[in-house]
Design a protein with these regions (language model features):
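Conserved small/polar residues in nucleotide/adenosyl-binding loops
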Residues: 128-134
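Glycine-rich beta-strand-to-loop/alpha-helix junction loops that act as flexible
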Residues: 74-76
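Canonical radical SAM enzyme core domain
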Residues: 44-57, 78-92, 96-127
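N-terminal pre-triad scaffold of radical SAM enzymes
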Residues: 2-43, 48-72
């Protein structure tokens, strides 16, 4: 209700907008064991998966086909994925889907990625912020 009141103040003409987005779960392998998560599988479980870059890209193609503009990409803390895998994934997605806004990785994932890679969380975030492309030049 408060959001509707604010919208009416900002847009008295009655304009309403929305985003078409999609959640993409790139892996369900995780070592964290969060109490609220029924999605994860521990390493070695026979129901684990990690999608290839091409599989993730196909999910984004499906979003683009319906006019979508953003993905939320999350998974687990997969100890088999090196830091470079995440960098390569983001670079691949930016190159192949330049018009899609990428909203990737939860704080716990970033902490886990850093730990698996022998980095501090600050180093991991700083490195990705400074080196990853945000759009194709």
């Amino acid at each position: 209700m408060a959001a509707d009141i604010r919208r009416k103040k900002l847009h008295p003409d009655g304009k309403v907008t929305y985003l078409v987005d999609r959640n993409v779960n790139y892996t369900n392998v995780c070592t964290i064991n969060c109490q609220f998560c029924s999605f994860y599988r521990p390493p070695g479980h026979d129901e684990t998966y990690t999608q290839s870059f091409e599989e993730i890209s196909q999910r984004i193609n499906e979003l683009e086909d319906i006019g979508g503009s953003r993905i939320l990409m999350q998974g687990g803390v997969n100890p088999d994925l090196e830091f470079s895998w995440y960098l390569d994934l983001i670079s691949y997605l930016v190159k192949n889907h330049p018009d899609i806004h990428l909203d990737c990785f939860s704080p716990i994932e970033i902490e886990g990625i850093a730990e698996v890679s022998g980095m501090t969380t600050l180093e991991a975030v700083s490195y990705t912020h400074l080196t990853l492309p945000t759009k194709v030049e």
